[in-house]
Protein backbone atom coordinates (compact mmCIF):
# COMPACT_ATOMS: atom_id res chain seq x y z
CA UNK A 1 0.00 0.00 0.00
CA UNK A 2 1.43 3.36 -1.02
CA UNK A 3 2.03 6.13 1.48
CA UNK A 4 3.23 9.46 0.17
CA UNK A 5 4.25 12.32 2.47
CA UNK A 6 3.81 15.95 1.46
CA UNK A 7 6.32 17.62 3.80
CA UNK A 8 9.65 16.62 5.31
CA UNK A 9 8.16 17.63 8.68
CA UNK A 10 5.88 14.58 8.52
CA UNK A 11 9.00 12.39 8.65
CA UNK A 12 10.09 13.70 12.06
CA UNK A 13 9.89 11.17 14.92
CA UNK A 14 8.98 7.50 14.95
CA UNK A 15 12.65 6.49 15.14
CA UNK A 16 13.43 2.81 15.79
CA UNK A 17 14.94 1.02 18.77
CA UNK A 18 17.87 -1.27 17.90
CA UNK A 19 19.17 -3.96 20.25
CA UNK A 20 22.97 -3.64 20.26
CA UNK A 21 23.67 -7.37 20.23
CA UNK A 22 27.28 -7.13 19.05
CA UNK A 23 28.13 -4.71 21.87
CA UNK A 24 26.20 -6.83 24.38
CA UNK A 25 28.37 -9.78 23.34
CA UNK A 26 31.66 -7.87 23.15
CA UNK A 27 31.14 -6.31 26.60
CA UNK A 28 29.71 -9.48 28.18
CA UNK A 29 26.50 -7.73 29.20
CA UNK A 30 23.76 -9.54 31.07
CA UNK A 31 21.30 -6.73 30.36
CA UNK A 32 19.48 -5.86 27.13
CA UNK A 33 20.85 -2.69 25.54
CA UNK A 34 18.47 -0.82 23.22
CA UNK A 35 19.51 2.26 21.23
CA UNK A 36 16.99 4.91 20.18
CA UNK A 37 18.34 5.93 16.76
CA UNK A 38 17.56 9.63 16.54
CA UNK A 39 19.88 10.11 13.57
CA UNK A 40 17.07 8.63 11.45
CA UNK A 41 15.12 11.88 11.78
CA UNK A 42 15.18 13.76 8.43
CA UNK A 43 17.89 16.26 9.40
CA UNK A 44 19.84 13.66 11.34
CA UNK A 45 19.14 14.36 15.01
CA UNK A 46 16.69 14.42 17.92
CA UNK A 47 16.61 18.21 17.56
CA UNK A 48 14.30 17.90 14.55
CA UNK A 49 11.54 17.13 17.08
CA UNK A 50 12.42 20.20 19.13
CA UNK A 51 12.69 22.54 16.13
CA UNK A 52 9.25 21.57 14.86
CA UNK A 53 7.68 21.80 18.33
CA UNK A 54 9.13 25.25 19.07
CA UNK A 55 8.03 26.71 15.72
CA UNK A 56 4.56 25.13 16.00
CA UNK A 57 4.21 26.63 19.49
CA UNK A 58 5.43 30.08 18.36
CA UNK A 59 3.05 30.17 15.39
CA UNK A 60 0.13 29.13 17.60
CA UNK A 61 0.95 31.95 20.05
CA UNK A 62 1.38 34.50 17.25
CA UNK A 63 5.07 35.04 18.08
CA UNK A 64 6.12 33.87 14.62
CA UNK A 65 4.44 35.33 11.54
CA UNK A 66 5.18 35.54 7.80
CA UNK A 67 8.29 37.70 7.39
CA UNK A 68 9.64 36.91 10.86
CA UNK A 69 13.36 36.16 11.27
CA UNK A 70 14.33 33.18 13.43
CA UNK A 71 17.51 33.70 15.49
CA UNK A 72 18.79 30.83 17.63
CA UNK A 73 21.94 30.21 19.69
CA UNK A 74 22.80 26.53 19.23
CA UNK A 75 25.77 24.17 19.32
CA UNK A 76 24.62 22.75 16.02
CA UNK A 77 21.81 20.24 15.80
CA UNK A 78 18.98 22.56 16.80
CA UNK A 79 20.29 24.96 14.20
CA UNK A 80 20.20 22.25 11.55
CA UNK A 81 16.68 21.19 12.59
CA UNK A 82 15.46 24.79 12.64
CA UNK A 83 17.04 25.46 9.24
CA UNK A 84 15.16 22.47 7.78
CA UNK A 85 11.75 23.29 9.30
CA UNK A 86 12.17 27.02 8.58
CA UNK A 87 13.04 26.20 4.96
CA UNK A 88 9.73 24.37 4.52
CA UNK A 89 7.85 27.33 6.05
CA UNK A 90 9.73 30.14 4.31
CA UNK A 91 11.42 31.84 7.27
CA UNK A 92 14.85 33.49 7.24
CA UNK A 93 17.06 31.83 9.87
CA UNK A 94 20.19 33.09 11.64
CA UNK A 95 22.13 30.58 13.75
CA UNK A 96 24.61 31.76 16.41
CA UNK A 97 27.13 29.14 17.53
CA UNK A 98 30.56 28.81 19.20
CA UNK A 99 33.42 28.67 16.69
CA UNK A 100 34.62 25.41 18.28
CA UNK A 101 31.76 23.41 16.74
CA UNK A 102 32.59 21.07 13.86
CA UNK A 103 32.95 22.36 10.30
CA UNK A 104 30.41 19.78 9.12
CA UNK A 105 27.70 21.31 11.30
CA UNK A 106 28.39 24.76 9.89
CA UNK A 107 28.29 23.53 6.29
CA UNK A 108 25.05 21.62 6.88
CA UNK A 109 23.24 24.67 8.23
CA UNK A 110 24.42 26.76 5.30
CA UNK A 111 23.26 24.03 2.89
CA UNK A 112 19.73 24.33 4.30
CA UNK A 113 19.82 28.11 3.84
CA UNK A 114 20.59 29.33 7.35
CA UNK A 115 22.95 32.26 7.98
CA UNK A 116 25.76 31.64 10.50
CA UNK A 117 27.21 33.94 13.15
CA UNK A 118 30.17 32.49 15.10
CA UNK A 119 31.11 33.48 18.66
CA UNK A 120 34.35 32.78 20.61
CA UNK A 121 34.49 29.15 21.72
CA UNK A 122 35.96 30.15 25.09
CA UNK A 123 32.65 31.83 25.96
CA UNK A 124 30.72 28.59 25.32
CA UNK A 125 26.98 28.65 24.71
CA UNK A 126 26.59 31.62 27.06
CA UNK A 127 28.52 33.73 24.52
CA UNK A 128 26.26 32.57 21.69
CA UNK A 129 23.11 33.34 23.70
CA UNK A 130 24.40 36.85 24.45
CA UNK A 131 25.12 37.48 20.74
CA UNK A 132 21.72 36.12 19.66
CA UNK A 133 19.96 38.50 22.05
CA UNK A 134 22.03 41.40 20.67
CA UNK A 135 21.02 40.50 17.08
CA UNK A 136 17.36 40.19 18.09
CA UNK A 137 17.42 43.76 19.41
CA UNK A 138 18.84 44.97 16.08
CA UNK A 139 16.67 43.00 13.63
CA UNK A 140 12.96 43.91 13.41
CA UNK A 141 10.46 41.04 13.54
CA UNK A 142 12.98 38.61 14.97
CA UNK A 143 12.10 35.68 17.20
CA UNK A 144 14.42 33.60 19.40
CA UNK A 145 12.93 30.12 20.02
CA UNK A 146 15.29 29.80 23.02
CA UNK A 147 15.74 26.04 23.28
CA UNK A 148 17.40 26.30 26.72
CA UNK A 149 14.36 28.09 28.20
CA UNK A 150 11.49 27.01 25.94
CA UNK A 151 9.01 24.54 27.54
CA UNK A 152 8.13 23.30 24.02
CA UNK A 153 11.58 21.64 23.98
CA UNK A 154 10.83 19.14 26.75
CA UNK A 155 7.18 18.95 25.66
CA UNK A 156 8.28 17.59 22.27
CA UNK A 157 9.95 14.61 23.95
CA UNK A 158 7.11 14.15 26.43
CA UNK A 159 4.67 13.93 23.52
CA UNK A 160 6.74 11.81 21.12
CA UNK A 161 10.05 10.28 22.27
CA UNK A 162 8.75 8.95 25.60
CA UNK A 163 5.59 7.35 24.17
CA UNK A 164 7.58 5.81 21.29
CA UNK A 165 10.00 4.13 23.70
CA UNK A 166 7.19 2.92 25.95
CA UNK A 167 5.23 1.50 23.03
CA UNK A 168 8.20 -0.15 21.29
CA UNK A 169 9.37 -1.86 24.51
CA UNK A 170 5.76 -2.69 25.48
CA UNK A 171 6.48 -1.00 28.79
CA UNK A 172 9.52 -3.14 29.52
CA UNK A 173 12.10 -0.45 30.21
CA UNK A 174 14.13 -0.33 33.42
CA UNK A 175 16.65 2.41 32.64
CA UNK A 176 16.68 5.42 30.32
CA UNK A 177 20.09 6.93 29.61
CA UNK A 178 20.59 10.31 27.91
CA UNK A 179 23.09 13.14 27.73
CA UNK A 180 22.18 16.57 29.06
CA UNK A 181 22.55 19.51 26.68
CA UNK A 182 19.47 21.73 26.92
CA UNK A 183 17.90 19.12 29.19
CA UNK A 184 14.86 18.74 26.94
CA UNK A 185 15.39 15.11 25.99
CA UNK A 186 16.03 13.76 29.47
CA UNK A 187 13.31 15.94 31.03
CA UNK A 188 10.48 15.21 28.59
CA UNK A 189 11.30 11.55 27.99
CA UNK A 190 12.16 10.88 31.62
CA UNK A 191 8.98 12.50 32.91
CA UNK A 192 6.84 10.50 30.50
CA UNK A 193 8.48 7.16 31.34
CA UNK A 194 8.29 7.78 35.10
CA UNK A 195 4.61 8.72 34.74
CA UNK A 196 4.01 5.28 33.22
CA UNK A 197 6.21 3.48 35.75
CA UNK A 198 7.78 5.33 38.71
CA UNK A 199 10.38 2.55 39.00
CA UNK A 200 12.06 3.50 35.71
CA UNK A 201 15.53 4.84 36.52
CA UNK A 202 16.74 7.85 34.51
CA UNK A 203 20.49 8.32 34.07
CA UNK A 204 21.95 11.71 33.12
CA UNK A 205 25.24 11.88 31.23
CA UNK A 206 27.62 14.84 31.47
CA UNK A 207 31.25 15.59 30.53
CA UNK A 208 33.75 14.47 33.19
CA UNK A 209 35.76 17.67 32.66
CA UNK A 210 32.66 19.83 33.15
CA UNK A 211 30.74 18.07 35.97
CA UNK A 212 28.31 20.93 36.54
CA UNK A 213 25.32 18.75 37.48
CA UNK A 214 27.21 16.39 39.79
CA UNK A 215 29.80 18.73 41.32
CA UNK A 216 28.78 22.27 40.39
CA UNK A 217 32.00 22.80 38.42
CA UNK A 218 32.03 23.87 34.75
CA UNK A 219 34.98 23.59 32.40
CA UNK A 220 36.06 23.09 28.78
CA UNK A 221 35.34 19.69 27.24
CA UNK A 222 35.19 17.90 23.89
CA UNK A 223 31.68 16.44 24.08
CA UNK A 224 29.87 18.56 21.50
CA UNK A 225 26.13 18.78 22.17
CA UNK A 226 26.10 18.17 25.93
CA UNK A 227 27.55 20.05 28.90
CA UNK A 228 26.38 23.62 28.25
CA UNK A 229 28.37 24.90 31.28
CA UNK A 230 25.22 26.29 32.90
CA UNK A 231 22.04 24.64 34.20
CA UNK A 232 19.31 25.20 31.56
CA UNK A 233 15.83 26.25 32.70
CA UNK A 234 14.34 23.42 30.63
CA UNK A 235 16.13 20.79 32.73
CA UNK A 236 14.10 19.15 35.49
CA UNK A 237 16.86 18.27 37.94
CA UNK A 238 14.45 16.00 39.84
CA UNK A 239 13.88 13.66 36.88
CA UNK A 240 17.21 11.82 36.93
CA UNK A 241 18.25 9.29 39.55
CA UNK A 242 21.97 9.26 38.81
CA UNK A 243 24.58 11.29 36.92
CA UNK A 244 27.42 9.55 35.08
CA UNK A 245 30.39 11.71 34.02
CA UNK A 246 32.13 10.56 30.82
CA UNK A 247 35.60 11.51 29.59
CA UNK A 248 36.17 12.70 26.04
CA UNK A 249 38.28 9.61 25.32
CA UNK A 250 35.64 7.14 26.57
CA UNK A 251 32.95 8.88 24.51
CA UNK A 252 35.10 8.78 21.37
CA UNK A 253 35.93 5.09 21.89
CA UNK A 254 32.28 4.12 22.38
CA UNK A 255 31.29 6.15 19.32
CA UNK A 256 33.86 4.32 17.20
CA UNK A 257 32.85 0.96 18.68
CA UNK A 258 29.19 1.20 17.67
CA UNK A 259 30.19 2.09 14.12
CA UNK A 260 32.54 -0.86 13.83
CA UNK A 261 30.45 -3.40 15.75
CA UNK A 262 26.88 -2.45 14.83
CA UNK A 263 27.23 -0.48 11.58
CA UNK A 264 25.67 2.55 13.27
CA UNK A 265 27.46 5.88 12.74
CA UNK A 266 26.74 8.29 15.58
CA UNK A 267 28.07 11.54 17.01
CA UNK A 268 30.13 12.38 20.07
CA UNK A 269 27.28 12.85 22.56
CA UNK A 270 25.89 9.49 21.42
CA UNK A 271 29.26 7.94 22.25
CA UNK A 272 29.08 9.47 25.72
CA UNK A 273 25.56 8.19 26.34
CA UNK A 274 26.47 4.74 25.02
CA UNK A 275 29.54 4.48 27.25
CA UNK A 276 27.43 5.38 30.29
CA UNK A 277 24.70 2.90 29.30
CA UNK A 278 27.28 0.10 29.00
CA UNK A 279 28.53 0.88 32.53
CA UNK A 280 24.95 0.60 33.84
CA UNK A 281 24.46 -2.66 31.90
CA UNK A 282 27.66 -4.14 33.39
CA UNK A 283 26.39 -3.89 36.96
CA UNK A 284 25.60 -7.38 38.28
CA UNK A 285 22.31 -6.23 39.81
CA UNK A 286 21.09 -5.16 36.36
CA UNK A 287 21.31 -8.60 34.79
CA UNK A 288 18.11 -9.24 32.82
CA UNK A 289 17.14 -5.55 32.87
CA UNK A 290 16.36 -3.44 29.77
CA UNK A 291 18.37 -0.27 29.24
CA UNK A 292 17.31 2.27 26.61
CA UNK A 293 19.98 4.73 25.53
CA UNK A 294 19.12 7.70 23.33
CA UNK A 295 21.68 8.36 20.58
CA UNK A 296 20.99 11.97 19.54
CA UNK A 297 22.64 12.33 16.16
CA UNK A 298 24.54 10.98 13.17
CA UNK A 299 28.32 10.74 13.10
CA UNK A 300 28.85 12.18 9.64
CA UNK A 301 28.95 15.70 11.10
CA UNK A 302 31.92 14.75 13.30
CA UNK A 303 34.26 13.05 10.83
CA UNK A 304 36.80 15.87 11.20
CA UNK A 305 36.80 15.68 15.02
CA UNK A 306 39.18 13.67 17.26
CA UNK A 307 36.58 10.88 17.55
CA UNK A 308 37.25 9.78 13.98
CA UNK A 309 40.64 11.30 13.25
CA UNK A 310 42.75 8.62 14.93
Can you say where each PLM-predicted feature lies in the sequence?
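PLP-dependent amino-acid enzyme catalytic core
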Residues: 1-310
Amino acid sequence: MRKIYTSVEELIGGTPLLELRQIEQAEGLGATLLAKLEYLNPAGSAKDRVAKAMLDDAETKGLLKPGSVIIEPTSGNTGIGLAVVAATRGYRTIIVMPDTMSMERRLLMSAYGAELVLTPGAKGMAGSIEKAEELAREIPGSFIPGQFDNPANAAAHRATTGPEIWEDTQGKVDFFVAGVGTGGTITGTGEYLKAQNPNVKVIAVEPASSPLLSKGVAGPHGLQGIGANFVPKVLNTQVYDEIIPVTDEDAYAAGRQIGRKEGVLVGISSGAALWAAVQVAKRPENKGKTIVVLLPDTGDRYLSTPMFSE
